[in-house]
Amino acid sequence: MQPTAIDSKSKSHPNERVAFIQACWHKDIVDQSRKGFVAEMAKQGYAESDIDIFEVGGAFEIPLHAKLLANTGRYAGIVGAALVVDGGIYRHEFVAQSVVSALMQVQLETEVPVFSVVLTPHHFHAGEEHQKFFFDHFSHKGEEAAKTCADTLNKVRSLRRLDAQQKAAC
């Protein structure tokens, strides 16, 4: 059987929906990732109405929501966004790593692509300089996530189509 090329440039995504889950901690900053994501997805051919927004208390709640949403079969992709900072009580790196690892597990178990904008800085304080930096940084990361999301959904769609064609040929 001859290998078939994968068309990863197609922007045809009828009825594809994306879920965007964001933590409410540091909401003003995390909101920037959502805004950047939605704006870039529009450039990629998705309507704002193709994106459902969900808010959860903190980063730790994102993986469960991602899995429940993936299991609905409604979403082609899911994004999780949070800012995990050192509150001086526990190791924030552990929380961020746990969340990102759980998001990876969700996508592997459900075969629904999951994207992370769960970020943890080395140092964070609520001063004006840090606020501006993280506003801009989260907006940029939201845009990056959108580009990756649109590209991955195109590729996954093509791979599934290829798989279906090969199964039909057998």
Curated annotation (Swiss-Prot):
Pathway: Cofactor biosynthesis; riboflavin biosynthesis; riboflavin from 2-hydroxy-3-oxobutyl phosphate and 5-amino-6-(D-ribitylamino)uracil: step 1/2. 5-amino-6-(D-ribitylamino)uracil binds at W25, A59, F60, E61, L83, V84, V85, S116. Its EC number is 2.5.1.78. One of its GO terms (molecular function) is 6,7-dimethyl-8-ribityllumazine synthase activity. GO terms for cellular component: cytosol; riboflavin synthase complex. The keyword Ubl conjugation does not apply. Keywords: Riboflavin biosynthesis, Transferase. InterPro entries: LS, LS/RS, LS/RS_sf. It catalyses: (2S)-2-hydroxy-3-oxobutyl phosphate + 5-amino-6-(D-ribitylamino)uracil = 6,7-dimethyl-8-(1-D-ribityl)lumazine + phosphate + 2 H2O + H(+). One of its GO terms (biological process) is riboflavin biosynthetic process. The active site is at R91 (proton donor). Pfam families: DMRL_synthase. Disulfide bonds: none annotated. (2S)-2-hydroxy-3-oxobutyl phosphate binds at H130. Forms an icosahedral capsid composed of 60 subunits, arranged as a dodecamer of pentamers. Belongs to the DMRL synthase family. Catalyzes the formation of 6,7-dimethyl-8-ribityllumazine by condensation of 5-amino-6-(D-ribitylamino)uracil with 3,4-dihydroxy-2-butanone 4-phosphate. This is the penultimate step in the biosynthesis of riboflavin. This is 6,7-dimethyl-8-ribityllumazine synthase 2.
